[in-house]
Amino acid sequence: MYTYMEYLQKCFYKSTNWNEDNIFSNITASSSAILDFPIPTGFKLDSSNKSTEYSASSFTLSNYHSINGSLAYLYSSVPLRNTMGTKEISLQDALVGFRIIEPSSNNHKQLSSSKRHDRSSLLYGRMYFPGSALEAMIIKRISAHTQLLIKCINNPHMDKNGTMIVYLQKNAPKYSREFIYSTNESLIGFRCLYNLGNSDNSLNTALIPKFDNSVISIGTELWYAARTMSPGLSTAFRYSTRSTSTGKPLTMTLAVNPILGHLSSTYTVKTSVASTFSSRYDFNFFSYASNLSLGFELYNYSRENPVHSFANRSVNLSSEENRFLSHQDRKVRGQHGGNTIPIRSHTSIAQKDHSNMIINPIQNLDNYYHINPTLLPEKKKLLDEVELAAHLSSENSESVTTAFQNLVNESDFASVVKFSTSLNDRMVKILWEGRVKDFLVSTGVKVGMNPVTNAPEFNRFGVSFSYAC
């Protein structure tokens, strides 16, 4: 679950059209949210208030080992009008979960409209007590695609009483780059992420299929600690797409660290509107050690607003949501009825005489090869019908994916249960998060096997209450 300050930071990014999914550090965010979720420790109470559209404050109190707490303030030069308190906020926005990766062509329009936020900034500070530990963060937008991020920590128990990390980030639709410097070990780093694929919509959709819902990203990071002369290197690959028949998204990642010999692959899929499954396989090709991690999250619908999202929608599969998604093609075709050319089946098109057609290595929908069919007058009508069929197929695919995403966004969930296990670590984590009255509550437990007695034991247990208005 996001803290209120983290939630406001995400609202700031959304208001200024900053795409977090295009940053290398978030390339495995979906699988990490399902497999590596944290368990609360002890008792924690978080009370927050947004006094104006530009400022907010937060007070946190916990009893882990001893009574301690913190006081935080946040200021944004951009009005955060799209924020809500814990009573009204949807769980999809308040909880860390599966991320639907948007194609770069879709993000291009959003980023191009952020010029009015070129000089926006966000200031954040937190003071911990008892003690004198401080933390601060500054986000300064330099241009529509570039920002400066500074994080500072002051703690008397740290070397030189603290540390500072500076990020210079450039986030463009097709790529992102980061230059990083940390005073700890004089660490210098560079990260980059590139999105592959052609976002040009001017291509002939009748001859070349569209994959607007698929995103392929390749990134790498380089590190060098000048004080200890230690290098670091890792690279990662991410493939995110959506099913053209149901609109359900999935994400696959592959990360490699050649210096440490570590390889990690993940597969995360949203199996339904209310459920997500994720798996991860880790392998070290130096020690041949391996580990398999499995996890899932399952949302529970609110009793006040049960699954009514499908009641007024014309949707015979395994669930109501699938019945809706399976009838998108019928709905789209109904919108074109009467005003378009009658569409014949692909079988009837294939029965046409193709003896006069010119062969070319571009295959059309009727399994024949064509080259510039407009030059063939007797095939002009056939071409129009094929193009119309391709247009309807593409529109149907877009409507299905959009419909599924709308169902996820509009569903009223009351709680979520997360489960994660690791075979090699021999542990189980269970987390429940939901709304109780006006509070957001998070409670969970981590159970592992004692390596000496080989008996199960509770490693961590806690409950957290969060209130914001």
Swiss-Prot record:
Keyword terms of this UniProt record: Membrane, Mitochondrion, Mitochondrion outer membrane, Transmembrane, Transmembrane beta strand
GO cellular component, one term: ERMES complex
Localization in the cell: Mitochondrion outer membrane
Any Pfam family hit: MDM10
Top-level taxon of origin: Eukaryota
Membrane-topology annotation of the record: Multi-pass membrane protein
Protein name according to UniProt: Mitochondrial distribution and morphology protein 10
InterPro entries listed in its UniProt record: Mdm10
Family to which this protein belongs: Belongs to the MDM10 family.
Domain comment (free text): Lacks alpha-helical transmembrane segments, suggesting that it resides in the membrane via beta-sheet conformations similar to those predicted for other outer membrane proteins and porin.
Quaternary structure annotation from Swiss-Prot or TrEMBL: Component of the ER-mitochondria encounter structure (ERMES) or MDM complex, composed of MMM1, MDM10, MDM12 and MDM34. Associates with the mitochondrial outer membrane sorting assembly machinery SAM(core) complex.
GO biological process, one term: protein insertion into mitochondrial outer membrane
Gene source species: Scheffersomyces stipitis (strain ATCC 58785 / CBS 6054 / NBRC 10063 / NRRL Y-11545)
Keyword Lyase in record: no
Role played: Component of the ERMES/MDM complex, which serves as a molecular tether to connect the endoplasmic reticulum and mitochondria. Components of this complex are involved in the control of mitochondrial shape and protein biogenesis and may function in phospholipid exchange. MDM10 is involved in the late assembly steps of the general translocase of the mitochondrial outer membrane (TOM complex). Functions in the TOM40-specific route of the assembly of outer membrane beta-barrel proteins, including the association of TOM40 with the receptor TOM22 and small TOM proteins.
